[in-house]
Amino acid sequence: MKNRLIGLCIVCACCLMAKADDLKLWYQQPAKVWTEALPLGNSRLGAMVYGGVVNEQIQLNEETVWGGGPHRNDSPKAFGVLPKVRELIFAGREKEAEKVMADNFFTGQHGMPFQTIGSLMLEFDGHADYSNYRRDLDLERAVASVRYKIGEVNYTRTIFTSLVDNALIIRIEADKPGAVNFTTRYSTPYKEYEIKKNGKNLLLSGHGSAHEGIPGAIRFETRTQIKAEKGKVNVTNDCIEVKGADAAVIYVTAATNFVNYKDVSANETRRATEFLAKAMKRPYAQALTAHEEAYQKLFGRVSPVSYTHLRAHETGRNL
C-alpha cells in the first residue's frame, strides 16, 4: 500500500510539472531575427522580445503609428466615368475599359503602412559567459521571461504588456544582492527623432515617415522610467544606467496624436505621460497580478482543442 501511495505521488508530481509547461513556448537560445522573438501585446502596445543576454532588444509597436497621414485616396473622377466603363465592358471592349479605369480610378496612394516606434535596448556588461539559458512565453499568463546564470548568480527578466496599466513592464532581478547592473537606450529607424532626458524619464519622440507623397503626420512619444530596489539609477540625455541594484523594474509607455483617420490633433506627450504615471502608481507584484487577472478573463473563455505537442518540449526543436 505504501509503495502504491509513493507511486501515485510521483505520477501526480509529473503531471503537475507537465501542466506547468503545457502552454509555454520555450527556447534555449536568444532570437537571432525578428520572427524568432517572442510577441507580447495588449491590443494597443506591442513588443517583440529577443531574449539577448549581453544585448537585449525589445522592439516596440503602438497601434496608431503609421506612415503618411489623413488624405483622400479615392479618385473624384471615378464616378463620372463609371457609365463609360460599363458601356465599354458591355460592348466587349475590356481593354479600353481597363485603360479608362487606370486613368481615372486610381490616385497613386494605396494606403498607409504600419510602422514601428523602434526598440528598447538593454546592455548587460560582463554577461557574455553565461549558462543555463532559457527564454519562454507563457500563453496562459501573457508573460515572457528570460533566465540564465553568470558564475554563481542567477538572473531573471519578466516582461509583460499590461492590459490594465497600458504599459510595457520589465522586471530584472538576481539572486545575489547588488548584482543588477545595466544600461537602457532607444534605437529607432527614423531619420528625424529626438531622445532626451525629461526628469526621471528617458524620452523618444518622432513622427511616421512620408509615404507615396503624403507627409508623415503621426507623431509619437515613448517614455521610459526605472524603479530600482537599492542601487542607483542615473538618467542622461541618451540612456538610463542602473548600478548595484537587487532588482529593477522598467516601465515603458507610448502614445500618438491619432484620434481617428481624419483627425491627428491629440497630444501624444500628455497621453504618454498619463499612461506612465498610472502604471508607476501600482507596485510591481500588484501590476503583474492585475494584468494576469484581466488577461484570464479573455483567455479563459476558450480552451485549446489540443496542445499536447507543446508539452515538455523545446519549441524551437519541435514546431
What are the roles of these predicted feature ranges?
Residues 1-21:
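Bacterial Sec-dependent N-terminal signal peptides
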Residues 21-169, 173-182, 187-192, 196-199, ...:
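Accessory carbohydrate-recognition regions in carbohydrate-active enzymes
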Residues 270-289:
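Short, cationic low-complexity segments
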Residues 40, 80, 167, 247, ...:
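Generic recognition of stable, solvent-exposed alpha-helical segments in well-folded globular domains
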Residues 309, 316-319:
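Single conserved hydrophobic/aromatic residue that forms the stacking wall/gate
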Residues 286-306, 310:
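An acidic-aromatic substrate-binding cleft motif
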Residues 173-272:
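Extended acidic/polar, glycine-enriched regions
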Residues 24-25, 305, 317:
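Low-complexity, Ser/Thr/Pro/Gly-enriched N-terminal "stalk/linker" regions
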